[in-house]
């Protein structure tokens, strides 16, 4: 019996996959009416120089005030916010699609998730990347993964 309470049509494994590529395919599947669960979000990667990536996310977290824009620090929140950016989340269709997506740290399901085509880190010759878990630690998130 799986620990997850969300009954997903598709389980996607984000381990060693490029976050943006996974997020775009997950958003597309959600818009098509499928319920999607993304597992191992803390091990998804963003390509590029670590200093630039961390600086970009620190800037996003610092923007706003007590009432203003909130940007997540945890890996699952960052991943879900990325998916939201690829959906028309201000329209009914986009809201429904966004509600049909769950992002998890680790894998609460009994079966392993599938790796989506074209998302694996193996496709790049670039060896510069940083995982979402490392970004979250730098941003000051409590490490629970």
UniProtKB/Swiss-Prot annotation:
GO MF annotations, alphabetized:
mRNA binding; rRNA binding; structural constituent of ribosome
Q: Which UniProt keywords apply?
A: Ribonucleoprotein, Ribosomal protein, RNA-binding, rRNA-binding
PROSITE patterns recorded? RIBOSOMAL_L13
Single biological process term from Gene Ontology: translation
Q: Which InterPro entries match?
A: Ribosomal_uL13, Ribosomal_uL13_bac-type, Ribosomal_uL13_CS, Ribosomal_uL13_euk/arc, Ribosomal_uL13_sf
Among the Pfam families in the record, one is Ribosomal_L13
Ribonucleoprotein: is it a keyword of this entry? yes
Domain of life, per UniProt, equals Archaea
Gene Ontology cellular component annotations, sorted alphabetically: cytosolic large ribosomal subunit
How is this protein organized at the quaternary level? Answer: Part of the 50S ribosomal subunit. Interacts weakly with proteins L3 and L6.
What role does this protein play? This protein is one of the early assembly proteins of the 50S ribosomal subunit. Binds to 23S rRNA.
- What HAMAP family does the record point to? Ribosomal_uL13
Give the family from UniProt: Belongs to the universal ribosomal protein uL13 family.
Q: What is the protein name stated in its UniProt record? A: Large ribosomal subunit protein uL13
Q: Say which species the protein is native to.
A: Haloarcula marismortui (strain ATCC 43049 / DSM 3752 / JCM 8966 / VKM B-1809) (Halobacterium marismortui)
